[in-house]
């Protein structure tokens, strides 16, 4: 079974009310499975499953947490959005290095396994001050203008 679906099913045991949005990309099978899983969700949990979207930044802007893998692009987007993260299943190598850095800097948490995922989500949702600290830390570390800064440096243009 796909690790994303395992995580979504694990979230069914959350205790706090929540809306969970699963962005399934172009994975039609995952989309179907999540929709099927959502039919059995407890009343306090609302599940949505969406196919590929170009509006990821809008979904991040209205979210309290991001749950997913620590790939480079994902981390760039979550940091630019100051969206606290719960990191799952990093691939050995670059994703493990990314996860280690983000965790050490206090911008994310990582459950020991998928079974503890609902506990971590409930814990963070119960502690808005902790989420605020994580968001602030992300704002301090993020460099959303990094590409412009590199280009300006290469071209010898004074920073904007």
Predicted regions and their residues:
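Donor-nucleotide binding loops and adjacent catalytic segments primarily
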Residues: 1-63, 96
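Short alpha-helical segment that forms part of, or immediately flanks, the ligand-binding pocket
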Residues: 57, 75-81, 100
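Acidic donor-binding loop of glycosyltransferase active sites
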Residues: 61-71
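Short hydrophobic beta-strand element within catalytic cores of glycosyltransferases
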Residues: 66-68, 84-93
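Acidic, glycine-centered active-site loop in nucleotide-sugar glycosyltransferases
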Residues: 82, 97-107
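C-terminal "capping" alpha-helix adjacent to the active site of nucleotide-linked donor transferases
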Residues: 104-105, 113-129
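A short, well-ordered alpha-helix in the C-terminal region of glycosyltransferases
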Residues: 130-144
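C-terminal alpha-helical cap of glycosyltransferases
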Residues: 143-160
